[in-house]
C-alpha cells in the first residue's frame, strides 16, 4: 500500500511538471529577462542583471461566459521574433527613434499573450482572436516583489471617505506618497505610473500603454509583498454634473469592466527597469509600444508652444480690466502669444 502511494504521488508530480512549462525571453543586451510559466496559472517573473525584480506574478482575464484566460491553458504554439529598426516620431522629442526588442507570442485557443523585452523594460498584453462579442469581467494583474520594497505611489483623492468606487472619478493629480508596500493604505487606489525601489539602485516603474476602449489600471496593496490591480466597472447609469456641469457622473455600475465586439489587442502592461535614475525620464517605451498613427495625412498638424490660462489662474498684471473667463482676458493672451512667438492659446474651460 505504501509503495502504491509513493507511486501515485510520483505520478501526480510528473503530471504537474509536464503540465507546467516555462518559456524565457531576454532583452537585446541580455540584462533583462522574463520567464513565463504556463499550466495551472499563467505567470511571469523579471530579473535584471541576475537580480530578482519580480517574482512569479500571475496574469489572467475573466470573461462573462466563465472562461478565464491564463488558467489551465496550454499554448498550441510559441513564436519568436526580433526587431531592430527605427520608427518615425514627427511630434515627439526626436524625429526618429531606435526600436530594438525581442518578442515572444504564446498562442492559446481564442487568445494570444505577447511579451516584449527591451533593454529598458518588459511588457506584455492579451490579444483576442475570436470574432464573437463578450464582456471582460476582470483582468488579473499582480506584481509580486521579492521583498517589502519601497514604493512611490500617487493615491487618488477620495471625494467621500468610505465610498470606494468614487475613487475612479478623479483628476489623476496628486503628490506621490513613499512607503513600503506592506504599509500602503489598502482601501486607497493609486494611479499610474508608480515606482518601486529594489536593491543596487534598481528601480521598477509600472505603467500601461495603448489604453483604448478599456478602463485604466489602478493598483493597491495585495497579499504580502504584492501590488494587485483594480479597474473601474463599466458605467450602467450616468448623470451630468461635476465641475461646472461638464462631466458625466456614474451613478450605477455594471458587473464587468469592458465590452469587446471584435478581435483586438488589450493594453500593454509595462515594467520599466533600470539602475540609472535618469533613464526613468528618458525611456521611450510608451511611444514605442503605442499603436502607429491612423492618420494618413499629418501635414496639417503644426506643433507649437501654448499660452495657458489655467496655469496662472487667469491672473494678469498691469491690465485695466477684471481678469477671468472673459473676452478681454483672452484678447490679452492672444496679444501676448503673438508678441512672443507663441503659436497657440488654449481656452482651458472658457
Where do the PLM segments sit?
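Short, solvent-exposed loop/turn and secondary-structure capping segments
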Residues: 155-156, 318-320, 349
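N-terminal accessory beta-strand-rich subdomains and adjacent acidic, glycine-rich linkers
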Residues: 21-289
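An acidic-aromatic substrate-binding cleft motif
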Residues: 257, 261-336, 340, 344
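Bacterial Sec-dependent N-terminal signal peptides
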Residues: 1-22
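Conserved structured catalytic cores and adjacent interaction surfaces
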Residues: 344-350
Amino acid at each position: 500500500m505504501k509503495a502504491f502511494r509513493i507511486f501515485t504521488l510520483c505520478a501526480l508530480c510528473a503530471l504537474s511538471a509536464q503540465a507546467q512549462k516555462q518559456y524565457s525571453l531576454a532583452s537585446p543586451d541580455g540584462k533583462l529577462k522574463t520567464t513565463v510559466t504556463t499550466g495551472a496559472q499563467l505567470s511571469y517573473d523579471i530579473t535584471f542583471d541576475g537580480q530578482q525584480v519580480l517574482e512569479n506574478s500571475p496574469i489572467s482575464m475573466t470573461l462573462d461566459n466563465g472562461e478565464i484566460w491564463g488558467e489551465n491553458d496550454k499554448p498550441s504554439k510559441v513564436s519568436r521574433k526580433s526587431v531592430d529598426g527605427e520608427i518615425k516620431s514627427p511630434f515627439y522629442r526626436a524625429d526618429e527613434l531606435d526600436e530594438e526588442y525581442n518578442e515572444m507570442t504564446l498562442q492559446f485557443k481564442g487568445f494570444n499573450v505577447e511579451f516584449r523585452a527591451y533593454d529598458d523594460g518588459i511588457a506584455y498584453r492579451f490579444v483576442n482572436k475570436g470574432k464573437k462579442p463578450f464582456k471582460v469581467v476582470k483582468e488579473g494583474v499582480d506584481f509580486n516583489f521579492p521583498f517589502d520594497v519601497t514604493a512611490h505611489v500617487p493615491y487618488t483623492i477620495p471625494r467621500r471617505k468610505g465610498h470606494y468606487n468614487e475613487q475612479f472619478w478623479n483628476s489623476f493629480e496628486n503628490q506621490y506618497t513613499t512607503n513600503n508596500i506592506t504599509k500602503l493604505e489598502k482601501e486607497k487606489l493609486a494611479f499610474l505610473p508608480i515606482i518601486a525601489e529594489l536593491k543596487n539602485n534598481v528601480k521598477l516603474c509600472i505603467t500601461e500603454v495603448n489604453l483604448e476602449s478599456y478602463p485604466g489600471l489602478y493598483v493597491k496593496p495585495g497579499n504580502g509583498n504584492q501590488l494587485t490591480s483594480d479597474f473601474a466597472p463599466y458605467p450602467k447609469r450616468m448623470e451630468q454634473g461635476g465641475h461646472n456641469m461638464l462631466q458625466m457622473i456614474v451613478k450605477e455600475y455594471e458587473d464587468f469592466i469592458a465590452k469587446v465586439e471584435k478581435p483586438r489587442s488589450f493594453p500593454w502592461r509595462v515594467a520599466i527597469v533600470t539602475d540609472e535614475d535618469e533613464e526613468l525620464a528618458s525611456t521611450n517605451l510608451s511611444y514605442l509600444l503605442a499603436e502607429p498613427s491612423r492618420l494618413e495625412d499629418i501635414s496639417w498638424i503644426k506643433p507649437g508652444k501654448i499660452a495657458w490660462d489655467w496655469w496662472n489662474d487667469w491672473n494678469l498684471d498691469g491690465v485695466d480690466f477684471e481678469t477671468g473667463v472673459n473676452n478681454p482676458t483672452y484678447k490679452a493672451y492672444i496679444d501676448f502669444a503673438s508678441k512672443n512667438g507663441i503659436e497657440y492659446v488654449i481656452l482651458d474651460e472658457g
